[in-house]
């Protein structure tokens, strides 16, 4: 279940970033500036009454660009569904997590993959 909870945490943080961007919030690409911006939003990212390190959220800014807000919302919901199905015995953990990872990868914007490949050439 640890992998599932880790995936959920990553997706949830990226969904929150995406939601803030949709509201018109702009995040700096400079980490020192971002740290100051993060103080304004840190309560939004609080998890289990703990505020994550700003650097962790800063690193997710680049990854979040590869997903749409709707895809992130759907993937967060899928994590809940997979957890429920595992706990109720509908599916086994290993294949369920594998399928979830495949869903996450399938939502990754192909444009960014092609852009990355062009940088390698």
Model-derived regions, located:
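C-terminal alpha-helical interaction modules of replication/initiation AAA+ assemblies
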Residues: 1-121
């Amino acid at each position: 279940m640890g992998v599932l909870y880790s995936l959920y945490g990553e997706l949830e943080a990226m969904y929150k970033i995406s939601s803030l961007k949709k509201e018109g919030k702009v995040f700096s690409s400079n980490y020192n500036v971002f740290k100051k911006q993060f103080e304004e939003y840190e309560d939004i990212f609080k998890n289990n009454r703990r505020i994550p390190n700003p650097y962790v959220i800063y690193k997710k800014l680049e990854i979040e660009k590869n997903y749409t807000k709707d895809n992130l919302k759907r993937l967060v919901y899928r994590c809940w569904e997979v957890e429920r199905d595992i706990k109720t015995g509908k599916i086994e953990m290993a294949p369920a997590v594998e399928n979830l990872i495949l869903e996450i990868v399938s939502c990754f914007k192909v444009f960014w993959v092609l852009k990355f490949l062009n940088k390698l050439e």
